């Protein structure tokens, strides 16, 4: 009997929270699944994982490794890094 009471109480509290934060949940889902949302940024045509500019699985994954080799060079200044980023962006 205690388990059933605890379960019903948990469901009631969960229902209360869900109805009070409906707009918040909708905003979170819109942020994740929307046109410019997080998932589109990761998996879309210009996403980070599989897109053209994707550093992990994109068409230019090997050239991005070259960029990482330069990025960890301690002798580069911030201006050098900006110029290098622009070169690799246009490459």
Curated annotation (Swiss-Prot):
Tree of life domain: Eukaryota
Entry annotated with the keyword Ubl conjugation = no
Name one cellular component (GO) term: other organism cell membrane
Name the organs or tissues of expression. Answer: Expressed by the venom gland.
Q: Which residues cross the membrane?
A: none
Q: Which residues form the propeptide?
A: 37-91
The yes or no answer to whether the keyword Chaperone is present is no
- Where found? Secreted; Target cell membrane
Keywords from the UniProt entry: Amidation, Antimicrobial, Antiviral protein, Membrane, Secreted, Signal, Target cell membrane, Target membrane
GO BP: any one term = regulation of defense response to virus
Signal sequence range = 1-23
- Residue positions of the PTM Leucine amide? 33
Role description: Antimicrobial peptide.
- Which family does this protein fall into? Belongs to the non-disulfide-bridged peptide (NDBP) superfamily. Short antimicrobial peptide (group 4) family.
Q: Report further notes.
A: Shows a low ability to inhibit hepatitis C virus (HCV) infection in Huh7.5.1 cells.
Protein name according to UniProt: Peptide Ctry2146
